[in-house]
Amino acid sequence: MAYPSTHPAEAADSSVVDLTGSSCPRLTAPSELGRRLAALDDRYIREQFVPLDDLAADWPGGPAAVRADIAAGRLPQPAYRLDDGTDMVPGDYLVPVAVAGSVAALHGWFVREFREAAERVDVPHDPETIEIEWQDYLGGGYFVCLRHATPATMAEKTRHIVDLNQLIADPHPADQVWCKRLRLGVEGLAAIERPFAILDPARWGTPMSGQWYGTFLRALYPAAFAE
């Protein structure tokens, strides 16, 4: 089995040569590699997210009010922070507040929406589980992984991951039905997830779900994705 690609070619310096004069990107110096990875990471974040203060400029009370609500645990934390200290959030960061009606109503809205979505996709939705999901939402991590971090997509992600874990716990790669279920699960998860920033695994200390349940599974079971 060939190893899957986890980094773009530009992450290393193609102009580096070994002692024979042959091209050898793997000899890229650590500092240059770090610079390149940081540049790719920064570019992705700026393309996918917007500065919190810019988004909150026209919000009642402006950025100061939004930051106060974040600090008080009433609104989610940012997705990323840039080198200059700029906090970055998705463009639809404040949409749930508008839908809920107010910051004060956001928690109640989240509980109702998650319960309904979880019932539809058959994942746990007891009060304790919903509170854990709410705290995870406030942590801002779902902005990193989901294209639109809503209670519905959070429940949907859980469903896909539960299904995929069950499939890989008892693999049957020669079974067409198993392969189809694996493919649908991987593709369904990919449809709601962001591509992820190149340094996210270092931030989180683990492979990202898009790698674990996407890149790695596609490499491990290529026949399931041959169609």
Over which residues does each language-model region extend?
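A broad "ordered helical/assembly scaffold" signature
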Residues: 42-45, 52-54, 71, 80, ...
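Charge-enriched amphipathic alpha-helical scaffolds
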Residues: 58, 62-81
